[in-house]
Amino acid sequence: MPSGQHSAQTTKAGAGLVLGLGCERRTPAEEVIALAERALADAGVAPGDLRLVASLDARAEEPAILAAAQHFAVPAAFYDAATLEAEASRLANPSEIVFAYTGCHGVAEGAALVGAGREAVLIVQKIVSAHATAALAGPATLRAEKRIQAAEAV
């Protein structure tokens, strides 16, 4: 297992999308799951395309994050702040406020990118609800396919 990662399960083979999640402590699971479903809908992908839910290691026991992983029937992976901060240059929405609290400039986007791998791109940039954030990362080819589909629909 890579340095900085904690995971109770291995990932599903063959799928490529990683859902990065961040939330305040004690955020209702329903809020996080609804936001996660919105991220998938925004990307135009099915829940079955998801292979992993990822977040900051400080949220490794957060019921809402674990509930989201269970809801989508995928494992959860948690990364330390230094691992997420290594992705800062790739974040679409870095936040100094998030950095002050967590030690990294983005939890949802950073976790999605780390979980999806070095060649991954953000498919859905950070979206927010009252108490949570979500982002989706995966292969660059998927983002290109979605752009082509959107252009063809016009």
Swiss-Prot record:
Gene Ontology annotations of biological process type: cobalamin biosynthetic process; porphyrin-containing compound biosynthetic process
Pathway(s) the chain acts in: Cofactor biosynthesis; adenosylcobalamin biosynthesis
Keyword field: Cobalamin biosynthesis, Porphyrin biosynthesis
Any one Pfam family match given in the protein's UniProt record, by short name: CbiG_C
Origin: domain of life: Bacteria
Gene3D superfamilies tied to this protein: CobE/GbiG C-terminal domain
PANTHER family for the chain: COBALT-PRECORRIN-5A HYDROLASE
Name of protein: Protein CobE
Gene: cobE
